[in-house]
């Protein structure tokens, strides 16, 4: 539902389907806004602490849940995989035989130390 609402709002405003990058930028700015709200500040150190609090910021983006790892601020999300195919329903290729690999299955260990 979140994704459908995002696509509809984007198409209404810009007259075209959103790209993958459009959704990522939208989600990234919303994650930043959540951290600023949580910090009650725009000061960098306060926002950093908000990103890292409680095991890392979590945001339910249009494409799914994203989690920021507190140690290195890497954002993890489910990995979408599939075969591309063209249909008359869309002016671009879509994914067929879609598979979503959980973020925990693709996360790599951080080398960052605090």
Regions found by a protein language model. Name each.
Residues 1-114:
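Extracytosolic ligand-binding ectodomains
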């Amino acid at each position: 539902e979140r994704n459908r609402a995002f696509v509809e709002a984007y198409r209404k405003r810009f007259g075209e389907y959103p790209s993958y990058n459009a959704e990522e930028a939208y989600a990234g700015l919303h994650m930043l806004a959540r951290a600023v709200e949580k910090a009650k500040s725009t000061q960098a150190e306060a926002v950093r602490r908000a990103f890292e609090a409680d095991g890392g910021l979590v945001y339910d983006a249009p494409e799914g849940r994203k989690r920021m790892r507190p140690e290195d601020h890497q954002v993890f999300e489910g990995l979408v995989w599939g075969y591309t195919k063209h249909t008359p329903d869309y002016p671009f290729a879509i994914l067929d035989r879609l598979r979503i690999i959980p973020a925990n299955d693709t996360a790599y260990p951080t080398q960052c130390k605090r």
